[in-house]
Amino acid sequence: MHSKSAVLNQSFIAKLAILCLPSLFLLTALGQRKHEPPVVEDFEHRAQQYLDTQKETHVDIKPSGSAAKIDQEKQEARQKIKQARPEAKQGDIFTPAIGNYFREQLAITLQGPDGAKIRASLRHAEPLPNLRLRVNSRYPSNLPLQSTPPTLLANLPYLPGELQYRIVGRTLVLYDVSSGLIADLLPNAISNQNKIKGK
């Protein structure tokens, strides 16, 4: 009898633990967010403000459409976002404080155990000609969209799927995936000390 009761108790405790796991994960995530530096919260807020503006354009880009149709929809989205952000400038999202934080995080990563591999990956990326990128402008369609090693971004704040980090030379670009716009950029994100040889 006692044995059966013990088994039932163990079964109940196991089920209770399973039910509590999602709550524990949620509490852990909330606890981690509480410990985020204010500068990260400021960045996330500014990035979300950009996405809110993007959503207000009400342009639905359908991936299943023809290439010409998708390009037309992207162009329409870019135009509406530009109209909604007529005064947009470098530093609206990457403020000086946020920019310094990002530079520090990138430097930490490049000086870490994966630094050599990251530098090699960037060194082998397709070279870009001297290029002047501007906020609220389209990333030039005739130039390759540089891929960024995931390990380089490990210490950077999380981004929603609509935005991506891109490294162009030594500049960090905040790239709007759906419209192809440059939401903001951070010059000299990679310091001279971490400059990629051959760049």
Question: How should these model regions be labeled?
Answer:
Residues M1-F12:
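N-terminal secretory signal peptides that target proteins for export/translocation
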